[in-house]
């Protein structure tokens, strides 16, 4: 009986668990940088047909170094034979084969992009209901992440600018290669100028510096980054004229603003005195409550200036003309000009004047 019971227990005992199977191999990811290249060349593909014409290829890759003939040779070499169009996938494969030391860099960029997006999504969901301490930590981590990325970007931009300058070098007019124009805003121009300044912390091909910057250099880069942010803020507050579509204007004293343009030609021997008087006048005029904006431009080829004044209305401008500062400036004009000044006024709808205070 005991044997029968033991046999019954053995028969109903659950089978021993199977040893865990090794995880199935993850699908092979594309080569490093492949996804990044796909996104880049998708932007170059203006008609979104998966191919680049030579015109699209030239517009995107022209850098002022390779001539149109050299670009055409590269265009044909990627595909292996002359063709009118080049598939973006073949272009991705071509660059993937030439990554060299940048292969881990691009792989890290792809991983970084995913990590940043994940962190941003989590922050968006959890920040509002987090404690004040956790919110402080999140802001600190985000700020430091931005600083580190900006420092890396500054180093890369310095290296890129140095290589471009060396590749272009001094060229004669016959050798100069034109780059197709691309729209670039004032913000890009401001940052480009700052990049030229930051290059003084120097990067050059063959340098043994592997990124171990001194404390002074790091502080210098941080100051440049802060200056970039300040430029962005100032540019956002710059006044601009912007018409409203199909706007119905109402007549009244405040329906239009006045723009006064004054062109002057200064005698060479009086430039210093005139410039001092002009600066005083601009400072005084800009401080007036009814003056929207005032600026002066100097022509480089001659001692000529153009002064622009934007006023809320004509009455405000005429009252300003009678002020002691304005009359003193007019006397300066009489004493220091080579020829009589030219004054032009024009009216704009007041609703066109938009001040962006964000």
Curated annotation (Swiss-Prot):
Per the record, what is one GO cellular component? cytoplasm
Q: How does it assemble?
A: Interacts with the N-terminal domain of APBA2. Interacts with NEK2. Interacts with APBA3; APBA3 seems to mediate the interaction between NECAB3 and HIF1AN.
User: Positions of the region Required for interaction with APBA3?
Assistant: 177-186
- The residues that cross the membrane are none
Q: What is this protein called?
A: N-terminal EF-hand calcium-binding protein 3
Q: What's the source species for this entry?
A: Bos taurus
Biological role: Inhibits the interaction of APBA2 with amyloid-beta precursor protein (APP), and hence allows formation of amyloid-beta. May enhance the activity of HIF1A and thus promote glycolysis under normoxic conditions; the function requires its ABM domain and may implicate the stabilization of the interaction between HIF1AN and APBA3.
**InterPro entries annotated for this entry?**
ABM_dom, Dimeric_a/b-barrel, EF-hand-dom_pair, EF_Hand_1_Ca_BS, EF_hand_dom, NECAB1/2/3
Asked if the Swiss-Prot or TrEMBL record annotates the protein with the keyword Calcium, the reply is: yes
Q: Which Pfam families match?
A: ABM, EF-hand_5
| Domain ABM: start-end pairs | 258-347
């Amino acid at each position: 009986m005991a044997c029968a019971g033991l046999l019954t227990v053995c028969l109903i005992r659950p089978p021993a668990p199977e040893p865990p199977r090794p995880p199935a191999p993850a699908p092979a990811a594309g080569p490093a940088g492949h996804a990044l290249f796909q996104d880049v060349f998708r932007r170059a593909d203006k008609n979104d047909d998966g191919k680049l014409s030579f015109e699209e290829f030239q517009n995107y890759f022209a850098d002022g170094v390779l001539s149109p003939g050299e670009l055409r040779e590269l265009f044909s070499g990627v595909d292996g034979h002359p063709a009118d169009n080049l598939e973006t996938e073949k272009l991705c494969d071509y660059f993937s084969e030439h990554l060299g030391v940048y292969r881990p860099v691009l792989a890290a960029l792809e991983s970084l992009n995913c990590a940043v997006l994940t962190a941003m999504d989590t922050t968006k969901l959890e920040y509002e209901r987090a404690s004040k301490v956790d919110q402080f930590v999140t802001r600190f981590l985000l700020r430091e992440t931005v600083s580190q990325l900006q420092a890396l970007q500054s180093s890369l931009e310095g290296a890129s600018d140095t290589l471009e300058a060396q590749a272009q070098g001094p060229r004669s007019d016959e050798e100069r290669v034109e780059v197709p124009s691309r729209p670039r805003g004032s913000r890009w121009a401001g940052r480009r100028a700052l990049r030229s300044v930051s290059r003084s912390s120097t990067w050059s091909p063959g340098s043994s510096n592997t990124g171990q910057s001194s404390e002074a250099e790091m502080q210098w880069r941080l100051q440049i980054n802060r200056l970039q942010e300040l430029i962005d803020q100032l540019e956002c507050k710059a006044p601009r004229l912007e018409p409203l579509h199909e706007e119905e204007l109402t007549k009244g004293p405040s329906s239009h603003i006045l723009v006064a343009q004054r062109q002057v030609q200064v005698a060479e021997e009086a430039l210093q005195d005139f410039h001092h008087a002009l600066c005083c006048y601009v400072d005084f005029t800009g401080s007036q409550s009814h003056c929207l904006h005032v600026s002066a431009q100097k022509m480089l080829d001659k001692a000529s200036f153009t002064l622009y004044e934007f006023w809320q209305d004509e009455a405000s401008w005429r009252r300003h003309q009678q002020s002691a500062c304005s009359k003193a400036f007019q006397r300066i004009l009489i004493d220091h000009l080579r020829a009589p000044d030219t004054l032009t006024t024009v009216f704009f709808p007041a609703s066109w004047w938009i001040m962006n205070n964000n």
